[in-house]
Amino acid sequence: AFERYDGCHGPGNLNAYACTKRAIELAKQNTIGCVALANTNHWMRPGNYGLMAVEQNCIGIFWTNTVPNMPPWGGRDARLGNNPITLAIPHSDTPVLVDVAMSMFSYGKLEVYKRSGRPLPVDGGLNKDQQPTKNAAEILETHESYPIGYWKGSGLSLALDLIAAALAGGRTTRQVGELPLETELSQVFICIDLDSLPDKENIAANVEATLRDMETSTPVEEGRPVHFPGAHMAEVRSDNMENGIPVEEAIWQQVLAL
C-alpha cells in the first residue's frame, strides 16, 4: 500500500512521526506500507522512527534527501546530499538499528569534533583549497564531505535522492539547493509487518543466530568485542535513563550563560 503526503513546510519531526505511524498502519493492513512525504523539513533523529517500527514488530526503512553538501565521486563541488537512511529490524529488547548518512561523517558528528578540537580519524572531506582534510571545522566551512565508500556512497546518495523525489512528488537535492534554506525535503517511510508473514518465528530465530555469530568475531582490539548496529545505542540509552543525559562542557556553559 502506498500513500503520498504534502508536509506543507511543517515541523519535520512531527511530519515524520505522522508518516511513520501511517506506514505502520498500512503495513498492519497490507504487510507492506509505504508513505512518501514532500515539502517537509529536517526530521531530527530518524532512529526514533525506526524504534517506532520495531515496537510494532515491523521492519522500518526510512530516508530523506538534503541540501547539496557532498561532491559526487570524481567531483570537487557539492552536487549530492548526504541523504541519511535508517534501517530497523526487530530483535528482542535490542533491535538492529542502522542509522547512517551517505557522508563519511554526519554534520552533527562534525560539530562534535569541531567543538572538541580533535581531528577526524580519517579524511572526512575537502577544505576550501579542495584538499582532503581531517579538520571538521574546515569541512563544515565548505560543506563538502566525502561519501561513504567513496564511489559507492556517491551512487547510493543519488539513487536515494531520485527515488525519494519521485515517490513524494517533491524536490530533488538539486532543487532543494536552489532554495535559500534547507527546506521542502522529500522523504520515504516504508514498514514491513513481520506478524503478517507465516514464518515469523523462523525469521526471529535467524536474526538471533546471525547476531550471535557476528558477535563471536575475534575483535581487532582486545577488550572491545564486536557489537551489532543498535547494541551500543541501547547501552547508552539505558545508562542515560539511569544516570541522566551527558552534555558537552562547552554546550553546558552556553546554557548557563543564558
Could you say what each language-model-derived stretch is?
Residues 167, 175-258:
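Catalytic-core signal marking the mid-to-C-terminal active-site face
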